[in-house]
Amino acid sequence: MAIERTFSIIKPNAVAKNVIGSIFARFEAAGFKIVGTKMLHLTVEQARGFYAEHDGKPFFDGLVEFMTSGPIVVSVLEGENAVQRHRDLLGATNPANALAGTLRADYADSLTENGTHGSDSVESAAREIAYFFGEGEVCPRTR
């Protein structure tokens, strides 16, 4: 298996629940290395830019409003088959369909406020990482 990087967001509703540490512990227990992370409060412009592929869809404005409603934690995770394994750990986008023990089953409040985001492909991960992390902000872990 190839070592990949994927991008993760702990969304405002999960940050408000004080479960950042619990989510990080689950990332590490699943074998991911956290190679970059920071907390920030998105501006409307940042949220619209990040979710630009959804512009014009009925849920877009509500998504932007939610994602700017409080701080988020963005992270870069590294590991074998990281994109798919991270998505498996997150669970279904709609928490009503998320399997027990997944992050969305445990921390989501609704389809919009589903607690977490994860890249859906290696290409998306690279684009999303570059959106939030500059050169030198992601640190390879050699130990």
UniProtKB/Swiss-Prot annotation:
Q: Which domain of life is it from?
A: Bacteria
Q: What are the subcellular locations of this protein?
A: Cytoplasm
Q: Which cofactor does it need?
A: Mg(2+)
InterPro entries annotated for this entry? NDK-like_dom, NDK-like_dom_sf, Nucleoside_diP_kinase, Nucleoside_diP_kinase_AS
EC number assigned by the record: 2.7.4.6
The UniProt entry, under SUPFAM superfamilies, shows: Nucleoside diphosphate kinase, NDK
User: What family does this belong to?
Assistant: Belongs to the NDK family.
What is the protein's given name?
A: Nucleoside diphosphate kinase
Species of provenance: Escherichia coli O6:H1 (strain CFT073 / ATCC 700928 / UPEC)
